[in-house]
């Protein structure tokens, strides 16, 4: 999926060109746009998503919180797409339903173009009354059109719901 993005560039000029007021205004606008309209997306999941024990499940998002450059689409709810090349901060916050089972830590995996790049884990609240929350982030270098997905894994012995999740992909 290709997303057209206009990033400010230095205009072509030759030695001796006069820097006009219009050129100054254009440069100022491009700089301000680059600061204010940072390339990034934030999406969230507002309903439960079931995760069977010992199964890797790709998080699916249902709400666009902020998406300046069309990096997420409801038609492909699991995918965050890099519109321009560069370094990105990928972040996720996942809330799991309370469980009284054990089974080891919950895992979050950051996946780039189908390949797992980072695995992060969090110990679980196993008292049966408190939810487990995970918050992880990493830096990934993306080319134009790279697809980032986030998967989760739990090993409690039964199906457990992700009760909420928020993900971000922001160019740094």
Language-model region placement:
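Extracellular jelly-roll beta-sandwich "head" domains, especially the C-terminal globular C1q domain
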Residues: 2-172
């Amino acid at each position: 999926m290709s997303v057209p993005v206009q990033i400010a560039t230095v205009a072509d000029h030759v030695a001796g060109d006069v820097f006009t007021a219009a050129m100054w205004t254009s440069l100022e606008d491009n700089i301000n746009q680059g600061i204010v309209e940072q390339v990034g997306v934030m999406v969230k999941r507002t309903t439960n998503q079931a995760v069977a024990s010992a199964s890797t499940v790709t998080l699916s998002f249902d709400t666009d919180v902020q998406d300046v450059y069309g990096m997420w689409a409801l038609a492909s709810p699991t995918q965050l797409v890099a519109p321009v090349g560069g370094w990105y901060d990928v972040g996720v916050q996942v809330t799991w339903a309370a469980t009284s089972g054990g089974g080891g830590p919950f895992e979050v995996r950051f996946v780039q173009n189908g390949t797992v790049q980072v695995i992060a884990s969090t110990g679980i609240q196993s008292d049966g009354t408190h939810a487990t929350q995970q918050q992880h982030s990493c830096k990934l270098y993306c080319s134009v059109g790279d697809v980032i997905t986030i998967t989760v894994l739990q090993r409690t012995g039964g199906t457990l719901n992700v009760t909420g999740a928020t993900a971000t992909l922001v160019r740094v």
